[in-house]
Amino acid sequence: MKKIITLLISTFFFIAGCSDNKQEESPLPVEGLEVIADNLEVPWSIEKREDTFYLTERSGNIVKIKDGEVERQSVELEEDVSTASEAGLLGFVLAPDFSESNLAYAYYTYEDGEEQFNRIVTLRLEDRVWREEDLLLDQIPSGTYHHGGRLKIGPDEKLYATAGDASDREIAQDLDSLGGKILRMNLDGSIPGDNPFAGSYVYSFGHRNPQGMTWLSDGTMYASEHGDNANDEINLIEAGENYGWPVIEGSEEQEGMVSPLFTSGDNSTWAPSGMDNFEGKLFVAALRGSAVLEFDLETGESREVITGLGRIRDVQIKDNDLYFISNNTDGRGDPQENDDKLYRISLSNLE
């Protein structure tokens, strides 16, 4: 059982409804922080390749940002995107050879009759339009809440996806279900021969609503996960392990189940989402926590490095800069003027 470090953070929060009357824009709260783009519509994922950003918007668009110019590109999918509650066009990652292939991977929600599912597909960019090309994995459980939805390509060149429990907690322990899992596949959608469960996409299980993934340079994998009202988690992920939900959460322990490296505890909520890492520290977007959080893997300490901008959905680190997106227009935030925004700050400003 891994060491549990319970983090006591005196953060008070509330869930505010989205207002049509946006508040006036406030001064940026951190020295060196700059706005790269604004007026984004519920952005979900950040991808940066050289000097160009690609962001997903939950409504079904991909936003290209280059040299200060913002272009909202259409996405043609085989199924209509469902945007109810937490659903939509969620995870997005560019293929390693994107500069030659114009290929990317996406995770989105759709309705099939009276049912709703998530699926993972490839998209190809042609004439400024993204078109669904191949269906890699379908019928990932979906509900009103807990979609998971993050996509990342690991250092092993496999595609990883987080899948929530779709508010059906029991499926997280069911290895025949894709819900409540971290999934792993080859880039063509096939099941890797070295996955921990033969013939299965399941890489780890017992997750409630995982929304972030990152790998250190040595290949160590971490994931962020929403707890049940509190007890949010940062987990060290290993193939085939059971992370406990719904049997245990937070600092609870049980034989055969892995407890988190960090937890928000019983009285605090982060609602952690996208994450990245730099020099032995994890940087995590926090929705209810309304912050970018830093977790020091050596000392076990944590702190808020960015606050005052509302809900934060995703982060990405490139060339010693931290990029992150706010998520105040998602119906649970308190939008300021010109929200939502893509921000940049040098990591040296956060020391």
Sequence positions of predicted segments:
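Acidic, Gly/Ser/Thr-rich repeat motifs that build Ca2+-stabilized beta-propeller blades
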Residues: D20-A163, T220-A223, W270-S302, N320-G333, ...
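Beta-propeller domain segments
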Residues: S82, A87-L89, D97-S99, A166-E304, ...
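Sec-dependent signal peptide recognition
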Residues: K2-L8
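C-terminal motif of bacterial Sec signal peptides marking the signal peptidase cleavage site
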Residues: I15-G17
